[in-house]
């Protein structure tokens, strides 16, 4: 774990709060809200649900140590610990107003660098994002994988993806990468994007051979052929709306040892908004689930901006 300037709290959400935190007591509409999760409005204004990253704006994070413990004659609203969800209809302290540091939930498959902006995502989690043309790009790391590889990152259904931008940190001559969705089109976002030079990669959108263009079918409806004697093919970019259960981001690279970098899924939706900034550097983590290795969520210390 990298160094960060605050002490991780023990069975609490707040790591640092110099001023009074805005606390609203709301009702858990379902038993899915854990302390530290980003929440949004439920059915009514006094209901909350875990933010889904798509449908509604986030307005706070679920607290823990601020919750009412109740009395011997009544049931406590507070879960047993910060890893346990609030019961349905429990009163949840929703923290907001910014200016404090808290433990939030990082989505599976992603890591952070201290200082990263964090945006609301599915299941009350957050993801690291970078400003990109057309929106914020969710950063996903890649290395050499010669067969389709599940990144562990699941796009929330209904999310708009307008682009995928590759950043090469370790280039290899003639290396390429495909990016798509598991169980869907493995090169639906990018098809043979070059990784031969370090830095950000510009798409090949115009070529004498249509198959040399690098935007995939999710981001191009159809190529346009010019009327020139030596015809050129142009791939006009569009956007993809995530759905039909095809949500898991995957990639495949050429057989290029030492290849490494990141790609950025440029996303947009009403519920996809900046909610904080990472206070620590974390690598993606895995765990064994039902005898299989899977990427899992982890806590991340963050300055809260909502």
Which role fits each region the language model picked out?
Residues 1-306:
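Surface-exposed, low-hydrophobicity beta-strand/loop segments enriched in small/polar/acidic residues
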